[in-house]
Amino acid sequence: AKIAAVSVAKGNVTSDAFLVPGDSPLKEVADLKGRKVAVAKGSSAHGQVLLTLRKAGLSTKDVTLNFLQPSDAYAAFTQKQVDAWAVWDPYTAQAELEAGARVLATGEGTSNGYTFQVAGTAALSDAGKNSAIKDLLIRLAKAQQWADTHREEWARAWAEETGLKIEVARAAVDRGGDLPVALDDAVVKSEQDLADAFSEDRTLPGKVDFAKFTDRRFQEDLKAARGGNS
């Protein structure tokens, strides 16, 4: 592998959602059988689709997956070209507030909520770049902690930088953002389970050993920046 996950943060999985239109007759995940579901291919939401369908006794053979990036999926969803949309914040909040979307299922019990920072192995082998990567990861972890304790300021900055409506940014931020956690065995196992789901669905061409794509060299350095998070 030419890349490695070097740090991880965990978000609130209630923001990872299967959305349906407000007037949809669908009441539970099992009702998705025979329906069209929009999702970004290879995304965390795609993984959530696989695991959520499995939990409901279904598979991707029971639904039609429309692989669309969020902006295209939003258009398809609002025009009712698809029956459901699997996505994350701020798109979840945007669809709820602007399109009257209803949450059919959240990521609770299926999504792990992890977001990884990845570095090139060549950069990790370079002393100068290695030091710069460590500095960046520490700054990011501190920024994530700050954003969580300064939610209104973060929501305003996010809205200003991205063009999100402030109420959408606030709704997403209020659910809780990504917070740094330790890149430990539990994280690796959880991500391995997700990789296995992708392999079983043949989205990935074969078995992937996620541990081989991790590098934990910065974990001690990040401990203080993580604060109360393990």
Protein language model regions, located:
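Residues at alpha-helix termini
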Residues: 1, 56, 98-99, 162, ...
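Short, glycine-/small- and polar/acidic-enriched structural segments
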Residues: 1-59, 64-67, 83-86, 104, ...
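Secondary-structure end/capping motifs
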Residues: 126-205
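Pocket-lining segment of extracytoplasmic ligand-binding domains
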Residues: 71-160
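Extracytoplasmic/periplasmic, Sec-exported soluble proteins
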Residues: 10, 24, 37-44, 65, ...
